[in-house]
Amino acid sequence: MPSEHPFSDGISTPNPKETMNDTAQITASYGRRYIVRTPDGTTYEASTRKKRVDFACGDRVRISPVNAEQVVIEDFLPRQSLLYRQDAWKTKLIAANVTQLLIVTAAVPSPSMRLLQRALLAAEAAGIEAVIVLNKADLPETALWREKLKFYETLGYPVIETRALENADLLRPVLQGHSNILLGQSGMGKSTLTNALLGSQTARTGDISAALDSGKHTTTHARLYDLNGETQLIDSPGLQEFGLHHLQAADLPRYFPDFRHLVGQCRFHNCTHRAEPGCAFKAAAETGAASPERLAFLQGITDELPG
C-alpha cells in the first residue's frame, strides 16, 4: 500500500531493511529536515544524528532505516564540490556536487551587482562553472542592466537572456550534462524558470514543495530535480547577501579572471596591490588593461576577510 506521508512522493516502500540501498542523494533540505532519494528512486524523509547540520542539497549520503518512510543520515560521501557562504557569524551550505552555477538576475526588482560579483567569486573558489541568466529580458528596464553585464562576458562568463514564461528552453543546452543550481535574489524568477523547465514534473513535485514550504509562495528550501538522466537542477531560496569569509585573502586574485594572470608578477611577494611600487595589479588598472573598479572590489573583499 503506498505511503500517505507527504514526503514519500506516493512511492510504496516495503520492509526497509530488506529493500533499502544504504546510499542516497539529498534532494531537499530545510533546516534539519531532509528528503533523500535512493538509486531505485524511492524517497524518504531523513533526519541526522546529534543535530548535525553539515549536509546540503545534492549531497550523496549513507543512510540507515528507521521505518518504511524515514531514515537517518549517517554521513556524506566524498563531494565533488561544495557551494556555501560564510559571514562573521555563521556558515550556510547552499549545495553540494554541483558543476554549474546559474546566477539568475533581472532588471526588476532592483538587481544587486554586489551579489552577482560575490557569487561569481564563490563559484571560482569552488571550481564550479558559472553562467549569468538575464531573465525578464523583454522588460524596457533591461537595457541598462544588459549593458553592465557585457563586462562579465568579456571575462568569459556566458550571459543568456530569457523570458521565463516563453523561452526557458534556451537554457536546456546549457544545463545538459551538468548538476546545476539556480541562485539569485528573490523575485528574479528562479522558481518560474524551474517550473518551465520541469514541465509535467511540476505537478508531481508540488506536494513535496508545498509541505516543505508550509504554503508559502516563495522558495524557502533548496530542492533538486532530475531534468533527464544526465542533468540535475537545484532551485534555491533567494539571497540578499553572499558572505565570503571562507576564502583566503592570498587566494583571492586567482578567483578573478581579469587578474589571475598577474599573480606572481608584483615586485614584492606579499604585495597588497595598493601603494607598493612595482605592483602589476595597480599598473594594469592605471593603464586600462584592467578595470579600476574591479581592483577596488578585490581590495574591498580582502579587507573583509578575517586575519
From Swiss-Prot:
Keyword Nuclease applies: no
Domain of life: Bacteria
SUPFAM superfamilies: P-loop containing nucleoside triphosphate hydrolases
GO molecular function: GTP binding; GTPase activity; metal ion binding; rRNA binding
Region feature (Disordered): 1-20
Cellular component terms (Gene Ontology): cytoplasm
Keywords: Cytoplasm, GTP-binding, Hydrolase, Metal-binding, Nucleotide-binding, Ribosome biogenesis, RNA-binding, rRNA-binding, Zinc
Biased amino acid composition, Polar residues: 10-20
Cofactor: Zn(2+)
Binding site for GTP: N135, K136, A137, D138, G184, Q185, S186, G187, M188, G189, K190, S191, T192
Binding site for Zn(2+): C266, C271, H273, C279
Keyword Nucleotidyltransferase: no
Name of the top EC class for this enzyme: hydrolase
Pfam families: RsgA_GTPase
First-listed, main subcellular location of the protein, grouped into a coarse class: cytoplasm
Family classification: Belongs to the TRAFAC class YlqF/YawG GTPase family. RsgA subfamily.
Description of how the protein assembles with itself and partners: Monomer. Associates with 30S ribosomal subunit, binds 16S rRNA.
Task of the protein: One of several proteins that assist in the late maturation steps of the functional core of the 30S ribosomal subunit. Helps release RbfA from mature subunits. May play a role in the assembly of ribosomal proteins into the subunit. Circularly permuted GTPase that catalyzes slow GTP hydrolysis, GTPase activity is stimulated by the 30S ribosomal subunit.
Name of the protein: Small ribosomal subunit biogenesis GTPase RsgA
Organism of provenance: Neisseria meningitidis serogroup C / serotype 2a (strain ATCC 700532 / DSM 15464 / FAM18)
